[in-house]
Amino acid sequence: MIENVSVCDLKMSKDLEEIENEIFTTAWPSETIKQKINNKEFKYWVYKKNDKLVAYLGVQFINDFIEILGIGVIEEYRKNGIAGELMNELLDFFNKSSYLKIILEVRESNDTAKNLYTKLGFNKISKRKNYYKNED
């Protein structure tokens, strides 16, 4: 079940922080997430399973494009198409919007994410050297 996080869902900021801490080496603190949820320039989609938050997708709106800030699925729910479902929600939103493009950053070693983005029609346009800490 996919839900849109809105201002009234600030209680989810702690859950989003926990998911980020589980998945990523550097995570946004819950206060930063709260600020983003309260800001119309950001949007979060969350995926719940049995009322448990198991995945999210966060974006920022910048001028005429959407930047994917993060997408994550907790380990026990991976390989079930959840990230793809969240991305399809974003693509549906994008197709109904006036935004011109979607951009994202992905770690060079993250083949799973790169495969998903390629499958969804994203193209590599450039590479930022030394963007990620501890890149392998």
Model-derived regions: residue spans:
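Conserved catalytic-core motifs of GNAT/GCN5-like acyltransferases
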Residues: E105, N123-D136
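Conserved GNAT acetyl-CoA-binding A-motif
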Residues: F94-E105
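Short glycine/proline-centered loop/turn elements that form peptide/ligand docking sites
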Residues: A83, M87, S109-A113, N130-E135
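Acyl-donor (CoA/ACP) binding surface of acyl/acetyltransferases
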Residues: E76-N80, G84, I102, R128-K129
